């Protein structure tokens, strides 16, 4: 699916989109809402019932063209199906981490995968924050041409959709 809320079976009142529309290269964002919310603010001007919302990214023609091109790629190249295949490959390539003595959990949702490191797997006792294990993995990754994202002692794989299976294997080897 395109959105995590779909996987969770949640229908939000508002859905905000930004970087994914243009890859973050051009300023564009979208605020989507339900018909119920829209209708609560829609009326004749004379009623002065309105939800006035605007921003500095409104109507940028280059950004809109980039977003339309992105939507075309998603439609024409079957990106979601390809991502399912890549996500399955990423799960397979990182499965060995589950057996590591200092990995509490490998968890994944689509193309985002997290490896949680702990001092003791059995008790899930964390490392002392001063040890900065996530930072050590990040630095090791950079030294080996891999960009991994640590959040504390959890290392995230958040690859671009253009990644190849060979590149996923490289990330798994380096991590």
Model feature map: region roles:
Residues 1-175:
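Conserved N-terminal phosphate-binding loop of PLP-dependent enzymes in the Aspartate aminotransferase
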């Amino acid at each position: 699916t395109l959105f995590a809320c779909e996987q969770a079976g949640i229908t939000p009142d508002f859905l905000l989109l930004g970087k994914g529309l243009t890859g973050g290269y051009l300023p564009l964002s979208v605020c989507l809402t339900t018909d119920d919310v829209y209708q609560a603010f829609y009326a004749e001007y004379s009623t002065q019932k309105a939800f006035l919302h605007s921003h500095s990214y409104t109507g940028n023609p280059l950004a809109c063209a980039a977003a339309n091109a992105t939507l075309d790629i998603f439609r024409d190249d079957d990106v979601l199906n390809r991502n399912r295949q890549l996500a399955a490959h990423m799960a397979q390539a990182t499965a060995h981490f589950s057996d590591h003595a200092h990995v509490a959990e490998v968890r994944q949702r689509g193309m985002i995968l997290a490896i949680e490191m702990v001092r003791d797997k059995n008790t899930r006792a964390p490392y002392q924050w001063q040890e900065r294990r996530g930072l050590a993995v990040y630095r090791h990754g950079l030294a080996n041409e891999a960009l991994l994202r640590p959040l504390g002692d959890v290392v995230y794989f958040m690859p671009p959709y253009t990644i190849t299976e060979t590149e996923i294997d490289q990330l798994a080897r380096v991590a």
